[in-house]
């Protein structure tokens, strides 16, 4: 019954998309695997496996070949009790804890940094995969704005507008994009259009739960991302480029010093 309601909602969303905006049939892809471990029993999020099938649906819409699940490194942490247990303290939920499964694509190196809600001062290092025994295993939880840089040198960049449902989805994109900008519409006061323009982002994807996709309040927050004012991101890019040049110069100086010491 509930699935039928969701299908009707998704159909309405798909019908009203503008040309050039592509619909990812996540529900259709997940329905093919309904008997697998797609949702936590004690939490409101999808699992790493459920998010993988969401990623497969995205790849089909984007014309990308998904990385086979069989080629990824699987890590598992047992004993996870999520929000449903935290809110109810129900013993039957406690007696059936979840397991957190992460699937790590092969051969990908990443660097993740996050910024506060209002500006680009004081960036903090983070990780794509965190050693957490809960849903924070994916991109270390929620932050207003995260930038992930990979060793995939294809020049492709993507921005992901998300709530916490998108965390487990983002981790699979590292195989396909050189840069990934992760924006949490609930917390970020950054101007997304300015960031996309300054960073020359190619793709934009919305990774949110059904309730967020149809809620007037959350739609308003996502719309605000286009109008909010913040520090120009191009200044951050200039600072990063200057730092790369400085690192390169220091690397050359270190090499020269080593050669001189040898003689």
Question: Which role fits each region the language model picked out?
Answer:
Residues 1-263:
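Extracellular glycan-modifying ectodomains
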